[in-house]
Each structure stands twice: as C-alpha cells, then as structure tokens.
C-alpha cells in the first residue's frame, strides 16, 4: 500500500492548499467591498473637480495654462503605470503590461523617449526588467490609497511637463467594470483634452467665478489638484480591480483543488480496491493449493 500512502499524502497537501486559497478568497471579498465603496465615494469628487477645472482652464482665453497647451513636436512622454504590490490576482497586471508594451513600441517606433513613474511593486519590477527609464516610484500603497503618498511621484512628472522635459503625460491602470471584469486603460492626462466647440461657446456666454486676487493662482492650483485627483481615482480603481481579480482567482483555485481532491480520492479507492482484490486472490489461491 505504498502507492496508497503516497496518494493520501497528496490529498492532505491539496486539502491544506485549499484551506489557504479559501481563506484568501474570503479576505479578498471583504477587501473588495471596502475598495469598491472607497472608489465609488471618490467618483463624485473627481467628477465635480473635473467640471470646475475644465471651466477654469478655458474660461480665460487671455491666460493659457501650460497644461492645456498641446505641443506640436512630442519628443518625450511621461507614463504613470499603476499596478498591484502583490500577485495572485489572475491576469490583472499582465493585461496592463500588454497595453503598456504595445504603446511603448509605438512611441519608440516614432522616436519618442519615455520616462516612467511606477506605482505598485509589480509594475516597478516589470519596468526595470524591461529596461525602462524609471524616474520615480511608489510601492506599499496598501489597500487604502492616500493622496499625501501619491503627490511625490506625481509631482515629479508634473514638474517635468512644466519644465518641458516631457511633452505629454499618460496614465495606465485597471478600470473597475464589475467583480468579474476589469479593463486595462490608457488615458492621457496632459495636455488636457481640448473642449468641444459647443462647450467652448457656452463658456463665453455662461457665468464665471469671482477670483481674488486674480485668476492665475486659482487656475494653477486647481489644475494641479485635478491631475492629482485623476491619479488617485486610477489607483482607487486599480485596488478595487485587484481585490476583485484576487477573489475570483482564489475561488477558481479552491474549486480546482476540490476537483483534484475528488480525483485523487477516486484513484486512492481504486488502488485500495485493487490491493484488497489481490490479497483475496492470493488467499483463495493458497486455500485451493492446500
């Protein structure tokens, strides 16, 4: 019964693995709900600041903030990539990496240089292996993103844009669709998207804010805060996506472990049955010989 003992050991090992994946699934489910609530709570602020920032940026044609001026000759771009710090979340990070690699190939083919800010340990490791020029990084964001942690790496990119070291800024993250679906998303942060002609016309005839002492410092501060809020929202969406993907991955692992245990038990029972049958046959044969 050496084979039977081996199979029992395998069954015990898979059962222990299943306990771990089941526990991780439950933890991820709890974190997912909190991350979704946090992400949804941040959306109204992001939408409101987007409206205010857009209004401020285009309401004063006499002052054009650098964030709204598109540059004709794009020689270098900045890329902020948001990923998870930990693995075991299915193909979440791999899907984001695929989008990044495809876009980087297009930029490189056009002779455009790339500076990278990596938020998340997985993205940092990937970009370093890729040989990318990582100018800033942030790891250990945790389950609750804090703006004071994000400001440092993001400001490095914003300063690079203001100083002309990069001509455009992009953000890559996993957008949360639902528990079963997360979509890798590449969005342009800078320069800000040009307004539609209808929106532009409405600004000229619509109300405006009263600025004290003047509009410039208000516009400068608001647009900076707007870009920071976009990055924060991207990180919040990515965390919700990560926990959802991890819960689904751990559930699949638990289900697979259950199937493997069933198959191993079947093999064990067949092996045991064959051993018993063999012993009985030997006993009968011995009795017949006597």
From Swiss-Prot:
It is a peripheral membrane protein. GO terms for molecular function: ATP binding; proton-transporting ATP synthase activity, rotational mechanism. One of its GO terms (biological process) is proton motive force-driven plasma membrane ATP synthesis. Keywords: ATP synthesis, Cell inner membrane, Cell membrane, CF(1), Hydrogen ion transport, Ion transport, Membrane, Transport. InterPro entries: ATP_synth_F1_ATPase_gsu, ATP_synth_F1_gsu, ATP_synth_F1_gsu_CS. Disulfide bonds: none annotated. One of its GO terms (cellular component) is plasma membrane. The keyword Coiled coil does not apply. Its main location: membrane. It is found in: Cell inner membrane. Belongs to the ATPase gamma chain family. F-type ATPases have 2 components, CF(1) - the catalytic core - and CF(0) - the membrane proton channel. CF(1) has five subunits: alpha(3), beta(3), gamma(1), delta(1), epsilon(1). CF(0) has three main subunits: a, b and c. NCBIfam families: ATPsyn_F1gamma, PRK05621.1-1. Produces ATP from ADP in the presence of a proton gradient across the membrane. The gamma chain is believed to be important in regulating ATPase activity and the flow of protons through the CF(0) complex. This is ATP synthase gamma chain. The lineage of its organism: Bacteria, Pseudomonadati, Pseudomonadota, Betaproteobacteria, Nitrosomonadales.
């Amino acid at each position: 019964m050496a084979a039977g003992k081996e199979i029992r050991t395998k069954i015990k090992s898979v059962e222990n693995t299943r306990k771990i994946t089941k526990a991780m699934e439950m933890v991820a489910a709890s974190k997912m709900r909190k991350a979704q609530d946090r992400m949804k709570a941040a959306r109204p602020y992001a939408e409101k600041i987007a409206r205010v920032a857009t209004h401020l940026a285009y309401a004063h044609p006499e002052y054009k903030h650098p964030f709204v001026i598109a540059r004709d000759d794009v020689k270098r771009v900045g890329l902020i990539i948001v990923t998870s710090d930990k693995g075991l979340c299915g193909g979440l990070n791999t899907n984001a990496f695929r989008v990044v690699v495809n876009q980087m190939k297009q930029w490189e083919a056009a002779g455009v240089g790339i500076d990278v800010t990596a938020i998340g340990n997985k993205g940092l490791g990937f970009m370093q292996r890729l040989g990318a020029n990582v100018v800033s990084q942030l790891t250990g964001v945790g389950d609750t993103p804090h703006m004071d942690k994000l400001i440092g790496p993001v400001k490095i990119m914003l300063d690079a844009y203001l100083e002309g070291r990069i001509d455009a800024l992009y953000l890559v993250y996993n957008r949360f669709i639902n528990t079963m679906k997360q979509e890798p998303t590449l969005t342009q942060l800078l320069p800000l998207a040009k307004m539609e002609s209808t929106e532009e016309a409405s600004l000229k005839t619509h109300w405006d804010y009263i600025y004290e002492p003047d509009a410039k410092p208000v516009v400068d501060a608001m647009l900076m805060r707007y870009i920071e809020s976009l990055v924060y929202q991207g990180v919040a969406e990515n965390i919700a996506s990560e926990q959802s993907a991890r819960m689904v991955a751990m559930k699949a692992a638990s289900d697979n472990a259950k199937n493997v245990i069933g198959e191993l038990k079947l093999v064990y029972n067949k092996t045991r049955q064959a051993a018993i049958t063999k012993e009985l046959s030997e006993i009968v044969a011995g009795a017949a010989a006597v």
